[in-house]
Amino acid sequence: MSASRPAAVMVLAAGEGTRMKSRRPKVLHEICGRSLLGHVLAAVAELEPQRTVVVVGHAREQVTEHLKSIAPHAITALQEEQKGTGHAVRMAIEALRAQNVELTGTVVLTCGDTPLLRGATLRDLVAAHEAEGNAVTILSARVPDPTGYGRIVRDAAGAVTGIVEHADATEEQRAVDEINSGMYAFDGALLSQVVHRLSADNAKGEEYITDAVALLRGDGHRVGAYIAPDRTEVEGVNDRVQLAEARRLLNARLLEQLMRDGVTVVDPASTWVDVDVRVGRDAVLEPQTQLQGRTVIGEGAQVGPATVLCDTEVGEDAVVSHTVAREAVIGPEATVGPYAYLRPGARLDRGVKIGTFVEVKNSTVGEGSKVPHLTYVGDADIGKGVNIGASSVFVNYDGVNKHRTVIGDYARTGSDTMFVAPVRVGDGAYTGAGTVVREDVPPGALAVSAGPQRTIEGWVERKRPGTPAAQAAERARARSEEDR
């Protein structure tokens, strides 16, 4: 089935979501790197609607600000008081009219808390709606336990005759497993007319959009329903339990697609990816790996176990284990970890080794260079073929400003070297163990700042008499004298 571009899509996002027990509006809670509302709008965008209207209410400032970053062209409609779904639709229509937009053609109504909704399902809903010539087409779903949901009522021929709420349903109707999702495709002109006929004469004093279905059918218009192929797509999120379940389901969907595209996921139950993550073929994701934001993993790379990468690029055939990296670039065939920390601005070229307990921040490390152990690299430019000795520190902060250190190609630095920036170590230069580099080191030079070793015989026995160390020293001295 093919569908035209809808005249408008309305997204209802005005509710408070009290069951979330949160200061944050429900629709702004996130799963897999995107807000609930963001997931819905991403599905809506696949329809390429002429207009998108988001109905806001509770915490409207926060929701509106969020919309500026994820859907800047969306129109916001204010529902000052939450008086029901029908009232929300009326506010959306008024917002469109304020921009001189009269609804003609198909209008889709969605909810802002259904993050598993697929764009393909919305396209099929619109296609079925237009092919059948319906005034309204309900997006329905078949569920194993329909308790609490409105049921889709059909006649003997299978034609939709209406929606009956659970409380009003007969025993026969309660046995029906096809439920109303609260999402619809409407004829825009008819919706604009019928929405003003909705009544708030009910227990809650609210206007319900479901009443529009009965009114349109009563006027002799055709009503239909399109059954979602996956019932989880229409499940809303109302509390933290449902939020966790939605996250699990979406993560499983994303991982399944990665595996079908040629990625090995060793343990899907402990591996988490965001929707904007990209992973190349033959990459391996080990257990307890989290890929967040816009992380990109190259072909053949191995990531994990116990690794968190956020907005990080990993090159082909790189190996990253037990590592946390944020806004970093890891080059092809590089090796990182275990227990490394790459902070924003860390750039590792091809074949770089970053070893155990190494932190890199706002620095470049050239091709084939190694920082193997217990080192902090901050605000540095390290050339190619360099080896940084264990326990070295790039001292980049003078208490007021940060300064850079430059290490030339093929330099070798001894263990426990301190580079007090700003300082430059030339190509092929060496530093001795324990050196504090405060001045530039010319190419090919050896920098040594430590003085001759001073040994004070008998110091422990005199200054720490009776201690285990002193006793051990006395025994060793006695053995030495016996050997003579």
Curated annotation (Swiss-Prot):
It is found in: Cytoplasm. Mg(2+) binds at residues 113, 238. Its EC number is 2.7.7.23, 2.3.1.157. This is Bifunctional protein GlmU. The keyword Cytoplasm applies. GO terms for biological process: cell morphogenesis; cell wall organization; lipid A biosynthetic process; peptidoglycan biosynthetic process; regulation of cell shape; UDP-N-acetylglucosamine biosynthetic process. Residues 241-261 are annotated as: Linker. The gene is glmU. Residues 457-484 are annotated as: Disordered. Pfam families: NTP_transferase. The active site is at residue 373. It comes from Thermobifida fusca (strain YX). UDP-N-acetyl-alpha-D-glucosamine binds at residues 12-15, 26, 79, 84-85, 150, 165, 180, 238, 343, 361, 376, 387.
